[in-house]
Amino acid sequence: MASALEQFVNSVRQLSSQGQMTQLCELINKSGELLAKNLSHLDTVLGALDVQEHSLGVLAVLFVKFSMPSIPDFETLFSQVQLFISTCNGEHIRYATDTFAGLCHQLTNALVERKQPLRGICVLRQAIDKMQMNANQLTSIHADLCQLSLLAKCFKPALAYLDVDMMDICKENGAYDAKPFLCYYYYGGMIYTGLKNFERALYFYEQAITTPAMAVSHIMLEAYKKYILVSLILHGKVQQLPKYTSQIVGRFIKPLSNAYHELAQVYSTNNPAELRNLVSKHNETFTRDNNMGLVKQCLSSLYKKNIQRLTKTFLTLSLQDMASRVQLSGAQEAEKYVLYMIEDGEIFASINQKDGMVCFHDNPEKYNNPAMLHNIDQEMLRCIDLDDRLKAMDQEITVNPQFVQKSMGSQDDDSGSKPSSYS
């Protein structure tokens, strides 16, 4: 091993044993070029360092190995990274979160390139757990995990990191930018859409769309298109975006989504035939955007919406008559829709198989059973917790030096603009 590398190993050992992590971070940041020049000796360096005791040194070496233009032995490197992430010292790597996250990004890109996304899901879950200060902290690795879960069509492992409400962002030594934030909410929305949890999907798309922005983001544009479709499926209309949404959305993103706005407009007429014609008209656009599956679900939801409207007019109705009124192909298709809607709790009805009549019923829920009371109790606890968090955030902002300085400056400007009362 070259003398410069020996010095690097000795410095890593010494600084690690002394607990001088800040100085160690400075060392590994300066040593990238040295390590890159000695690629053939890096496995020897890894052998001389202990993963648990010298986590930052091992991280620096693995990061450089993954940065190579071509990786000669990917399987060995993957095993080394897998072992490192599972056994490294979490307290140590939090001093170099930018490099640790960078290693995870490199791993993700390599697995995507090799079409092996499933292999990285468990590794990235461990990486997030090592890096997070708490379960409500968002890291840039979250977006990597969601990307691999989508590509592998393996959604459930990511749900543990999607079902929590994020309250904080890991700054990653200043390296965190908007892209992983947008990707987390966009990919998360796609995962929830795939699981047909449309309410949560809509929330995630909204977070991506309403991110403060000064320029058009392709991720925001794609999230906006899916937001329109999921809104129609869930609510039968496009939900109004919050007032704090960036002007970029109205000025640039909406004009780039004309086909989707046309779809929403035709959907509001409750005419399936017109909607089918519009889908045929913009078939190429919807297919290119990979949204044809959602568009078909919009058409299906319009049939359901029209069936729900019938429940407000009729007490009983034949399946054939229902099919005619909502423009379905026949009684058999109408029966299929009614059975699915009964199963999902979208309508309350029964079908008489003898005469093919559908009887509509009132909602049997009386809101007085123990399960319902438990749900209400849980919602109240969530509201109390949210109120406590808002108060804590408000207090944190109130004592923030930048906020105090800015608010005092505003007060000075206001007092300076007032006319003097003295003559």
Swiss-Prot record:
Tree of life domain: Eukaryota
Main location: cytoplasm
Domain (PCI): residue spans on this chain: 197-365
GO annotation, cellular component aspect: COP9 signalosome; cytoplasm
Residue ranges, annotated region (Disordered): 403-423
InterPro entries assigned: COP9_N, CSN3, CSN3_C, PCI_dom, WH_DNA-bd_sf
Record's subcellular location: Cytoplasm; Nucleus
Keywords attached to this entry: Cytoplasm, Nucleus, Signalosome
One Pfam family recorded for the sequence: CSN3-like_C
Assembly: Component of the CSN complex, probably composed of cops1, cops2, cops3, cops4, cops5, cops6, cops7, cops8 and cops9.
Family affiliation: Belongs to the CSN3 family.
Function recorded in the entry: Component of the COP9 signalosome complex (CSN), a complex involved in various cellular and developmental processes. The CSN complex is an essential regulator of the ubiquitin (Ubl) conjugation pathway by mediating the deneddylation of the cullin subunits of E3 ligase complexes, leading to modify the Ubl ligase activity.
Protein name, entry field: COP9 signalosome complex subunit 3
